[in-house]
Amino acid sequence: MRLFPKSDKLEHVCYDIRGPVHKEALRLEEEGNKILKLNIGNPAPFGFEAPDEILVDVLRNLPSAQGYCDSKGLYSARKAIVQYYQSKGILGATVNDVYIGNGVSELITMAMQALLNDGDEVLVPMPDYPLWTAAVTLSGGKAVHYLCDEDANWFPTIDDIKAKVNAKTKAIVIINPNNPTGAVYSKELLQEIVEIARQNNLIIFADEIYDKILYDGAVHHHIAALAPDLLTVTLNGLSKAYRVAGFRQGWMILNGPKHNAKGYIEGLDMLASMRLCANVPMQHAIQTALGGYQSINEFILPGGRLLEQRNKAYDLITQIPGITCVKPMGAMYMFPKIDVKKFNIHSDEKMVLDLLRQEKVLLVHGKGFNWHSPDHFRIVTLPYVNQLEEAITKLARFLSDYRQ
């Protein structure tokens, strides 16, 4: 009998946010168990509704949105994206420099496939959003992880970045605000990273999907505005700030000089054409979202759900003996550290599996974000306060006598 194994290209590709632990949670649900899910940044299931004006505009445009559009996206949506970034000081891009995709996830994969040859290297943060590492690997490249320092508010370690640049390095990825740590980078830090890219002729990929989800007066700086002389690729979308993850609307905008990237851009154009276009009806949400009332502010200011849930989750998690955590300044996650000696932990995946089976709470282990040690896990802070209290109380109870 002929067997059809998994492609060798996927041998070192992983995405543990929806990996084996998630599959076990689905199995438990099928058996009738209720699972408290703190594993994925999907706002809608937790009562975060899309702004009404976005839904209205999508519905109004449905009759004219039944066919394909330009492979890069609707002109009106791309124009709105360009104007938004112009207002942020990013001036070196036109409508033709914007690609709209079925979520940022599709565009990350496209961006890597168009750029990398076998053996090319991309600097990726550790910890990272794992799709970046997966996309680099799937494209034949090598993800080289630079350290983000927990003792320095999870900021990237500049010396480690410098040490890992070599002749094979083509690009550096910056995730700011950061997933999974919630760090928001200072302007001075970003300028140091820009200088490394400048000295080594690197493309900068800026994953800024959480740029509007900021706490305690934190300020987000667009790295493309700090590097007008470099090719920067900024990625963002509607999933988080506008609470429409299911619309699958993301964009990628190229800023800076492009004369030395004509081949790369041809590759992006080819890949965009091969998938014809992104979901057309939902592209009508982009112009309304970027130009309308920014309702996300209601959630991040004092009294807002996201801020209050961040505060409650942080207060509860840091009361558990053996757990420490850097307070996140942005996004919708925490990345606590667990004392592996106290709990004799050798496998963080086993720990979250044991928690799931015993307490029916679903988390993602740190190695799922390419962290190098089994001493972290990620908590999503989207659930209501009472749900967070229940989940973290169960975590504390689980850890009270847990030993591997």
From Swiss-Prot:
Domain of life according to the entry: Bacteria
Gene Ontology molecular function, alphabetical: L-alanine:2-oxoglutarate aminotransferase activity; pyridoxal phosphate binding
Organism: Haemophilus influenzae (strain ATCC 51907 / DSM 11121 / KW20 / Rd)
Pathway this chain belongs to: Amino-acid biosynthesis; L-alanine biosynthesis
Family in the record: Belongs to the class-I pyridoxal-phosphate-dependent aminotransferase family.
Protein's GO biological process: D-alanine biosynthetic process
Ranges in a coiled coil: none
Catalytic activity: L-alanine + 2-oxoglutarate = pyruvate + L-glutamate
Protein name: Glutamate-pyruvate aminotransferase AlaA
Keyword Transferase attached: yes
Keywords, in A-Z order: Amino-acid biosynthesis, Aminotransferase, Pyridoxal phosphate, Transferase
